[in-house]
Curated annotation (Swiss-Prot):
Residues 104-106 are annotated as: Interaction with target base in tRNA. The gene is mnmA. Keywords: ATP-binding, Cytoplasm, Disulfide bond, Nucleotide-binding, RNA-binding, Transferase, tRNA processing, tRNA-binding. Belongs to the MnmA/TRMU family. It comes from Mycoplasma mobile (strain ATCC 43663 / 163K / NCTC 11711). This is tRNA-specific 2-thiouridylase MnmA.
């Protein structure tokens, strides 16, 4: 029997994780709930439909976590990382949007909070044999692998974790599908059995994103320009509200639909192109920074990558790795590979590592407006 601390979020996945560890594997289980966002302290007003509710979603999750702990007869503790989350994850998110990039906060939330500050707190206060979460992934010998349920696999979001962070982590849901997890919860009358999965920004939740950003970044209006003709075809309130390839641009009176082809942040220009024009979204090579190498013994001939979550794997070749910078090529080409997002590399089921997409190229030329 081992002493295991479970990150209990108040959702069905972490609830079943705790149930499996205690009642199927007979471990000593301690639950810890993290509170990482405070809508009032963080000025989360615009775009927040929950702001006037009697109980905010974070407190509702805490109530559900306490109910699960009571059902399972395990102790539960609460820890507050609101300041740490704001300083180490949220300020990065806002600055990336301010720079016209499209960040992935969930990956840094995992690196710095769920598997950073949380592990530090748990080690100091409980000294467990292992730490468990309800993520869909596998860890073997401090290496990261995909989960059995490819549709729910979260190794993409865990790609910035170090081997040191992974060494005491276990994922009890690694070989289970979501249907099986909900069945286990229902058969054992767990109060979270039918609870909706959390979506939106890590620990913040669903928001009207344009309004949400206005809480933190002032509008920066500028021209919408046809990238082929250089003609001004409209106005925007800020390039941060648009992402590469986006088609919802609200241009009226146009003969054909347009998509976002890029931007010039300095001159506040949003470039668009007609769907009948040349494809301005393609790339066949990228540079990524802050690359985190998890598996050093990978097979160079068997590599694939994802440029966004749930994307089908695409074959790639590593051209160069220099400290924490990597260059890769993908001869089959790909559309809308977006700076600020993460590229995550796989060798079969093994997650080799991941980094932040910094630049993209097409046929030897830099995509200067991506």
């Amino acid at each position: 029997m081992s002493k295991i601390v479970v990150a209990l979020s108040g959702g069905v996945d972490s609830s079943v994780t705790a149930f499996i560890l205690k009642y199927q594997q007979n471990h000593e289980v301690i639950a810890v709930f993290m509170r990482n966002w405070d809508s009032f302290a963080n000025n989360d007003i615009l775009g927040n439909e929950d702001i006037n509710q009697d109980i905010c979603p974070q407190e509702k999750d805490w109530e559900d976590a306490k109910k699960i702990a009571s059902q399972l007869n395990i102790p539960i503790y609460r820890v507050d990382f609101v300041k740490e989350y704001y300083d180490e994850v949220f300020t990065y998110l806002i600055e990336e949007y301010r720079q016209g990039r499209t960040p992935n906060p969930d990956i840094f939330c995992n690196k710095y909070i769920k598997f950073g500050k949380f592990i530090e707190y748990v080690e100091k206060n409980f000294n467990p044999d292992f730490i468990a979460t309800g993520h869909y992934a596998k860890v073997e010998n401090s290496l990261l692998y995909r989960a059995k349920d490819r549709n729910k696999d979260q190794s993409y979001f865990l790609s910035q974790l170090s081997s040191d962070q992974l060494k005491k982590i276990i994922f009890p849901l690694k070989d289970l599908t979501k249907d099986v997890i909900r069945k286990i919860a229902a058969e054992n009358n767990l109060v979270t059995a039918q609870k909706k999965d959390s979506t939106g920004i890590c620990f913040i939740g669903e928001r009207n994103f344009d309004k949400f950003l206005q809480n933190y970044i002032p509008n920066m209006p500028g021209n919408i320009v046809d990238i082929e003709t250089n003609e001004v075809v409209g106005q925007h309130v800020g390039v941060m509200y648009y992402t590469l390839g986006q088609r919802k641009i609200n241009l009226s009176g146009m003969k054909y639909p347009y998509y976002v082809a890029g931007h010039d942040l300095k001159n506040k220009i949003l470039y668009v192109a007609s769907i009948h024009s040349k494809n301005y979204l393609k790339s066949d090579k990228l540079e990524a920074i802050e690359f985190n190498l998890i598996n050093k013994n990978f097979n160079k001939k068997n590599l694939t990558a994802k440029f966004r979550y749930r994307q089908e794997d695409i074959k790639i070749e590593i051209l160069n790795i220099d400290k924490n910078k990597i260059e890769i090529s993908y001869p089959d080409e790909f559309e809308a590979v977006t700076p600020g997002q993460h590229v995550v590399i796989y060798d079969g089921e093994s997650c080799v590592g991941g980094g932040i997409i910094n630049k993209t190229y097409y046929k030897g030329n830099l995509n200067q407006f991506h």
